[in-house]
Each structure stands twice: as C-alpha cells, then as structure tokens.
Curated annotation (Swiss-Prot):
<keyword id="KW-0472">Membrane</keyword>
<feature type="topological domain" description="Lumenal">
    <location>
        <begin position="36"/>
        <end position="464"/>
    </location>
</feature>
<keyword id="KW-0333">Golgi apparatus</keyword>
<feature type="glycosylation site" description="N-linked (GlcNAc...) asparagine">
    <location>
        <position position="186"/>
    </location>
</feature>
<feature type="glycosylation site" description="N-linked (GlcNAc...) asparagine">
    <location>
        <position position="310"/>
    </location>
</feature>
<protein>
    <recommendedName>
        <fullName>Glucose N-acetyltransferase 1</fullName>
        <ecNumber>2.4.1.-</ecNumber>
    </recommendedName>
</protein>
<feature type="glycosylation site" description="N-linked (GlcNAc...) asparagine">
    <location>
        <position position="248"/>
    </location>
</feature>
<comment type="similarity">
    <text>Belongs to the GNT1 family.</text>
</comment>
<dbReference type="GO" id="GO:0000139">
    <property type="term" value="C:Golgi membrane"/>
</dbReference>
<keyword id="KW-0735">Signal-anchor</keyword>
<keyword id="KW-0812">Transmembrane</keyword>
<dbReference type="GO" id="GO:0005774">
    <property type="term" value="C:vacuolar membrane"/>
</dbReference>
<dbReference type="InterPro" id="IPR050587">
    <property type="entry name" value="GNT1/Glycosyltrans_8"/>
</dbReference>
<feature type="topological domain" description="Cytoplasmic">
    <location>
        <begin position="1"/>
        <end position="14"/>
    </location>
</feature>
<keyword id="KW-0325">Glycoprotein</keyword>
<feature type="glycosylation site" description="N-linked (GlcNAc...) asparagine">
    <location>
        <position position="180"/>
    </location>
</feature>
<keyword id="KW-0926">Vacuole</keyword>
Amino acid sequence: MKLVLGNGLVNLSWEYMLSFSILLYFIFTQLIFVFEDHSLAKNLKVIPSEVINALFDNFNKNLNFDKYAYVQYATDFDYLNLAIINFIVLRRSSTKIPNLVVLFNRALQEDKNRFDGLRDLSLRYSVTLKPIPIIENVNAESPTWSKSFTKFHIFNEVKYDRIVYFDADSMLLHTQWNDNSSIVNNESNVPENLDELFTIPEIIDIALPQAYWLTKHTKASGKIKAPDGKGYQDEITALINEISKSVNDSLVFEKLPSLLVQSQKSNHRNNFFATHVMVVKPSNEIFNELKKYVHNPWLWSLHKRHALRNKSDYDMEVLNKFIDNVLQENENFKVGILPHKVYGVLTGEFRELSHESFVSEAQFLPFITGELNEQWRPIEIIRNIKLIHFSDSPIPKPWEGMNNFHFYNKFRIYCHDAGFDADLFNSLFPTSWKPRLTTDCDSVNIWNWIMAEYQKLHNELWMV
C-alpha cells in the first residue's frame, strides 16, 4: 500500500523509532549487570616466587634466549637515561638475555647534543634504542601522565616471543644484607637479574603483580583466614613437587593457585594489577585493541561502553579494563599474578605505618588482619626484593633532587632510637616540616640506602 499523504508522518515515525532504539541500546550497555565469570579461576592464577625459581632451575637450559627481550620505554631524556642505566646494571648482572631494548620518543633525536651522549652510552653496553611515536590522549586530566600510554608499544614488539618489562623509574637491587641492617660489602654485590621471569608457563599471555596498596579488605576476613607460615610453605613445597613432574605447560598453569574468592578481582576492575613490571607475550592484536581503549573510536565505543576511558585513566587503569574484559570474553586468555613482594615493591612501603597488605600473599590479600603487621621484618623483606619502583609522592624522585627544607620532608622518616640526637635532628631539618620519628630504624636505614644506591649510579652514568 502506498501512503502519499502520510509519507511525512511515516518517515517521522521511523526517525523516532531509530532514535528510541539507539537510546535503549545506550541505556542497556550502561546498566547491564556483569555476572561473575566462573571461568576466572581457570584463567587467572597466582605464581608464587618459589614456583618461579623452581621453573627457572628446571627449564632455563632449554630456553631460546635470542627470542626474549627486556624492554623499557621513555618519553623524555630523564627516563631515557634511567632506562639505559637500568640496562647497564642488567648487563653487569650477567643476564643471559641478549636483547635489551628501550623504546623512546622519536622526537628526542632532534636534540642532537643530548641524544648523542645517551646513544653512545647505550652502544657501549649493547643496549638497543628504538624510536617510536608517542601514544597520547590530549583529553587526559594530567599532562604528566598523558604519554604513559606509550608503554603499550611493548605489545607491538612481536619479533620477540616474550618480554619482561619494567618502568624506567625502577631499580634492580642486590639482596646480601647483614642482620644488623647493614649491606654486605664485597665484589659480588651486583644486583640480580630477572631472567627467571622468562620461564613462567608459556601459555600465560600476561603476568603482573597485584597493586597491593590499593586492596580493599573484605568483610569475610573473619570467616576465611590465610594459612600460617608453615602451612603455606607446606602447600608451596607440595606444589613445586607436582610441577616438577609436569612437562605440559597447560598442566603447570592449571596447578597454580587461584584467588580465594573471585570477587577479589571484580572489586578492583580498574586497579587490580600494577603495571610497572610485566611479563608479556607480544601481540599486534592486543596492541591495536589497547589503542582503541586509549582513543575510544566512536564505532568501537558503541559496544564497549563499559570500557570507555575516563579523563583520569592512564596506562594502569586502561590495561586493567582491557584485562578484565578479555578475561570475561576469551576463555583462552591466561593471566598470571607475579609476587609483589619480589617484583612489585614501592619505595614508599618502607615509610608506611602499617604493612598488612604488603606482607600478605596475593591470593590472601582481601583477608588481611592487623596481626599481619607483625610479619613486617624489613631486613628479611629487602633480601627478597629484586626490583623496586620509586614511588614516594609528594617526595621527589631521587634524580629530581630533594632538600631538607620543603614541605615533603614531613612525609620522610627518621630513626628514633637510644642514640637519637634532638639537636642534630633539628639542625638537619630546621623548618616545621620534619620527618616522622619512628622506632622502625631498619626501615629508615633501608629507605636511605636505596636512595644512596641510586645516587651512586646517578653520579657514574647520568648524562642529561
């Protein structure tokens, strides 16, 4: 039937129907309830440090090191210098990995005077500098962090089978400490490498530590308790014995512990993982998808409303959203949780008043209690740390310089023991912004030592 007079009305009704359909779609995608994915336990596993070391001892001789790489990235000269310093330390640690790659902002090459000095330094230690375009979102809330998405270029390095990545504002540590909180001084006191991370099960697409400092504690803490020290070690020993008998990569992954409750992950969709150290399996597909998570193209946004980037979202939040979505959508995507007490430590942890979240194992993090703070033994802890991330805001990073007069000194710590000298303390910090006094002098000594260790490297290798 042909409606001539009503044609305008018919067209109008179709426009209303189309608009109404689009509106319903947006409401649905915004309000849809995401049910807990019961397959999470199969695809998200905790990798205890003891297991990582056992895998390395058993399988490192079979690795093709030429297909592996350590990678860092840098968007400015300071971080380029830091990345090169870290890789010089790695070379000194006798790493077996030949490929040390710094992905850097290609615009830095335009400042020939500064760039040439860093290029020459990198050549001396066989460090590869690879220029890349910046990944930036101009709508980001903070210009300081807007270029952090450049980190995602590591996923595009598909010439390598596996990459161990860590932020340039990190430092490798050595672990030989005396019980009196003094460093053992001998020629072998070179920081250890992270080569063992290349031997985690190949089936794992990405492995990261948990952002332990952001963990929310669950009300179930009174009902579920982590095993005591001996009980946990017995479980780990049994696990290692099982894994040592497995030659199948999938079976090894299957035997790894899961989170105690899956809500531990769902309660931290945007900040469960820390991204300052990662083990990744490079993939063009993942790289291209992450760029969409950064820039939110309109067609992609239509079916990814829950993944849209907020102005305050940067590399950590974006990667967490991506991992969360892929774990729900792809049953073949495998994720490992690295031990934060070895690879994910923040320097600021030594200034904290309480350490319950830090001392807990990853799978027990939501169920921590105040009693765990008794397990904070700084000397034992520093002996196990292999990589530490400089994070003490508002205290400046050590290469930015600090003094004893500014407001941030009130966030520092100072030893208050039997030998405390009040006159010396007041002369060192003459303003009202004084460090917090603490009887945890081991933590004070370790924090100061970390800063001093960085300064030694700075004095030797800083070029810019």
